[in-house]
Amino acid sequence: LNNFNKRKKNISKNFIVISERNNILSNFAKKNNLMFFEHNINLSGRYSVLSEVGLLMFNLDYKKIIQGIDSVLKKGLNKNLIRNAATLLTLIKKSKIDTHVSLIYSHNLLSYGYWHQQLLAESIGKKGKDFTPIISECPKDHHSIMQLYLDGKKNKFFTFFKTINNKLDQPIKDYFDQKFKRKSLNNIIDSQFNATINIFKKNLIPFRVVLIDQKKPIQSFISLIVYSMLETAILCKALNLNPFNQPAVEEIKKETYSLLG
């Protein structure tokens, strides 16, 4: 805002405000004639990604968004949802699993990973309970924390995330070992992904695999978002937790506000 004021730019043509009514932001928007979208007060931040908060900036085909949502609610994934949530609940309660590790093998899924981390932490981390979410960017983390995952404390559940049907990339030229000849970077990452799964199976480490189809990227990604929110809400209800609040963090907000005078 300071920059725009210094350059005498019209902020009404460059800013959009998304907020609840009758607060500092909405009053600012009204005063400066900014485009304003009212946000539902009952839709907490981490669950708002498919509202105007998450979708306004993207020119997405709404039909594909609906297809992604329907694939979870109407096409059989709902049965998997209940079954998987029940499995996770059993692991949490009976196997002393208290950590969820996301092994992300596709760089473009990292933003999802950090959102999912927030979703789990703020929804389940209450009343002395937790399912601590950790993000691992793979195969980079094969060379750091993977040793702990494989041979450390057995208190973790893992989810492998990867995109499939990616655009073909260029094969590596014959600079190195013959084994790499005519192999692309995707081929090498696929091999590392599959090798890790094989070792997890061998060591009886609990995990699941989530694959995002790049032939239908919007539908697949929306399905993943919806599935994640519903699974988390089901887990919270089974653990007698409110999935939609974050009371401990609210205390910091109140304390910060009081310190500002």
Language-model features: locations:
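Glycine-rich phosphate-binding loops that contact phosphosugars or nucleotide phosphates
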Residues: 1-77, 254, 258
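Predominant activation on well-ordered alpha-helical scaffold segments within soluble catalytic domains
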Residues: 2, 51-57, 66, 114-121, ...
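Hydrophobic/aromatic beta-strand patches that form the interior of the parallel beta-sheet core
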Residues: 16-18, 35-37, 101-103, 158-162, ...
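Short beta-alpha connecting loops at secondary-structure transitions
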Residues: 37-42, 180-181, 237-240
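Acidic catalytic cores of enzymes that act on phosphate-bearing nucleotides/polynucleotides
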Residues: 62, 66, 74-199, 203
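Small/polar glycine-rich anion-binding or flexible loop at a beta-alpha turn
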Residues: 137-138, 211-221, 248
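Short glycine/proline-rich, acidic loop/turn segments that cap or connect secondary-structure elements
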Residues: 201-202, 219-234
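C-terminal amphipathic alpha-helical interaction region
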Residues: 241-261
